């Protein structure tokens, strides 16, 4: 018992010896709380400023390329409205101050330039009251607006709003675009990903894309994964590999050796990765067309791959799942020349395909590292 007591004392003494040894200034809890609030407000404002930039590019990409999304389209007007209640709980205490929101009515925090909402005269700061006589709810506002537009389609929307205390009536004429959500995720890594249900653009991408044309290439690339059916094709390739591996596993099992599905699992992964680099090249190619069709001048936008090489130096030489950054830079230069030639000759701006486009897949696999 005495030995154990000395062991505890020795352990405490050793921990104390390893503790910080400087005499730090004392911080007031109130000062920390005040600084925390300042940073929370700044972060939320920055997020929605970045989201506005992404939404502007995404709106144009979706609207200009609706034909490639086949039946997966919906009506859109190009605005975002929020209330403190419609945001996650952790933002409620400061979102009204950060974004100048109202609790009693949804406040418009973003209007895409050139969108139906902008054309109708809706402005940032307007307070929405009703769409075609239906009150706009103060909870789940973005989802409600999206659902209303899916049901309403391209029919005009009479919007009643309040601006500076004065009620106004405006008519918005929606446009139809690709329905896939394009969301902003806070993540410093410059990356983007897509699955058949959504596209995710990480905040690091907005940091490294110096122009909206560069950002449009990234969004177009991710949309290309979906419209070209890459996820579906990878799943089929994986199933083929898995089937072959199952045959090998079964052969070993007949000989009394249990492999634990080793060959099935390995060949499934190999099958899914078989054309990964080719799919990425195709998404770059198709995405360049999508960006151009949306009105972006992509000449020089291939520089995004030189910037990416600074962030991910391994991409300069390694091409395990994606082309190298030099290949992607040079490919986009050639695609830009191809598009420019078509524009000069008055030809349709559609990618040159070997076969008809595939429908969006139903698997949930993601294409990462754009």
Regions found by a protein language model. Name each.
Residues 14-17:
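C-terminal motif of bacterial Sec signal peptides marking the signal peptidase cleavage site
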């Amino acid at each position: 018992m005495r030995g154990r007591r000395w062991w505890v004392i020795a352990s405490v003494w050793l921990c104390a010896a390893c503790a910080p040894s400087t005499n730090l200034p004392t911080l007031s809890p109130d000062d920390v709380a005040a600084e925390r609030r300042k940073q929370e407000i700044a972060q939320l404002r920055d997020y929605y400023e970045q989201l506005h930039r992404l939404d502007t590019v995404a709106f144009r990409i979706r609207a200009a390329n609706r034909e490639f999304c086949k039946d997966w389209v919906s009506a859109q007007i190009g605005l975002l409205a929020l209330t403190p209640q419609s945001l996650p709980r952790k933002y409620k205490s400061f979102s009204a101050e950060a974004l100048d929101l109202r609790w009693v009515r949804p406040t418009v925090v973003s209007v895409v330039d050139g969108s139906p909402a902008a054309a109708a005269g809706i402005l940032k700061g307007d307070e929405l009251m009703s769409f075609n006589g239906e009150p706009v709810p103060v909870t789940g506002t973005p989802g409600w607006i999206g659902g209303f537009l899916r049901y309403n389609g391209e029919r005009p929307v009479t919007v009643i709003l309040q601006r500076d205390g004065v009620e106004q009536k405006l008519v918005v004429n929606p446009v139809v675009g690709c329905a896939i959500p394009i969301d902003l995720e806070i993540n410093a890594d410059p990356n983007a990903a897509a699955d058949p249900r959504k596209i995710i653009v990480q905040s690091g991408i907005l940091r490294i894309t110096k122009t909206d044309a560069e950002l449009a290439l990234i969004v177009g690339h991710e949309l290309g994964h979906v419209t070209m059916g890459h996820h579906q094709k990878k799943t089929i390739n994986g199933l083929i590999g898995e089937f072959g591996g199952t045959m090998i596993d079964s052969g070993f099992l007949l000989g009394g050796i249990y492999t634990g599905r080793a060959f099935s699992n390995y060949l499934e992964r190999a099958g899914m990765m078989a054309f990964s680099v080719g799919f990425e090249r195709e998404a770059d190619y198709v995405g360049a067309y999508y960006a151009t069709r949306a009105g972006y001048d992509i000449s020089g936008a291939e520089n995004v791959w030189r910037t990416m090489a600074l962030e991910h130096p391994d991409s300069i030489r390694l091409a395990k799942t994606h082309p190298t950054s030099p290949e992607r830079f040079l490919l986009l230069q050639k695609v830009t020349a191809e598009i420019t030639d078509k524009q000069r000759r008055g030809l349709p701006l559609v990618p040159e395909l070997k076969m008809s486009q595939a429908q969006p897949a139903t698997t949930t696999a993601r294409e990462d590292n754009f």
